[in-house]
């Protein structure tokens, strides 16, 4: 799927999610006020609550994800390769560069969060930066940048805030999005084998601590329903 197609699909999914949340909260407010004998005034209160939840959820989700991952701003002096690769990819695509963070973990993994492509954050673990070679790291970073630029990161970030709602994560973070980001990242680097090699290393390495709010964000999350099997992702990349 091309980037513009991903953007359209992710925006539709976001709109559907917002509509569902608004409808659910409005209905809840209405039922409560009817039960209390207050008439239909609760419908307005429910709608107001829904607007607040939807408006603040992406920002809350981003802050929660960075906090739970223990992410700190990436020092360019300490991690120059990280900064240089992201800058190069952003310039090549002509798209915004996210804020860069590093999580102090031996596990090799990465994720992206944000409200939109101009206000996004890319998080990698220390283990990722020390485990992968330059070509492999570029493949992973391109994958995450695709999530950001396709507006997929906004959906996933909303999932951090609202992920406890049954079934909502399947809508916000479908398994298909990983295939799309793999393909988009490979198109950006023009070298699918780099990401293939990275996925193999990540799948066989140490995994980050299992925090339910972050599970759907990681590029590798074995056994999670929001991620397709790594072997299937590799097979798809090898067909490009």
Residue ranges and their predicted role:
Residues 92-119, 171-174, 185-240:
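Active-site-proximal gating segments in proteases and membrane effectors
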Residues 1-111, 162-171, 175-179, 189, ...:
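Hydrophobic or amphipathic, alpha-helical segments that drive membrane association/targeting
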Residues 145-161, 192-193:
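Catalytic Zn2+-binding segment of zinc metalloproteases
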Residues 123-139, 172-175:
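Short pre-active-site segment immediately N-terminal to the catalytic Zn-binding motif
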Residues 62, 86, 124, 139-147, ...:
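Active-site recognition of the HExxH zinc-binding catalytic motif
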């Amino acid at each position: 799927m091309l980037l513009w197609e991903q953007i359209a699909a992710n925006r539709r999914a976001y709109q559907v999610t917002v509509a569902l949340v608004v409808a659910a909260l409005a209905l809840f407010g209405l039922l409560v006020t009817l039960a209390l004998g207050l008439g239909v005034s609760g419908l307005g209160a429910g709608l107001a609550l829904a607007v607040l939840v939807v408006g603040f959820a992406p920002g809350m989700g981003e802050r929660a994800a960075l906090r739970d991952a223990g992410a700190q701003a990436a020092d360019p002096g300490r991690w120059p390769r990280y900064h240089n690769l992201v800058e190069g990819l952003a310039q090549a695509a002509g798209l915004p560069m996210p804020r860069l963070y590093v999580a102090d973990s031996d596990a090799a993994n990465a994720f992206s969060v944000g409200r939109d492509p101009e206000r996004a954050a890319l998080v990698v673990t220390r283990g990722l930066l020390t485990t992968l070679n330059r070509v492999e790291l570029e493949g992973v970073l391109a994958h995450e940048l695709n999530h950001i630029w396709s507006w997929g990161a906004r959906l996933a970030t909303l999932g951090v805030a609202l992920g406890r709602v049954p079934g909502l994560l399947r809508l916000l973070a479908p398994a298909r999005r990983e295939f799309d980001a793999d393909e988009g990242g490979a198109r950006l680097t023009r070298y699918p084998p780099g990401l293939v090699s990275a996925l193999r290393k990540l799948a066989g390495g140490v995994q980050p601590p299992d925090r339910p709010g972050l599970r759907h964000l990681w590029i590798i999350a074995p056994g999670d329903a929001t991620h397709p099997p790594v072997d299937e992702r590799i097979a798809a990349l090898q067909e490009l």
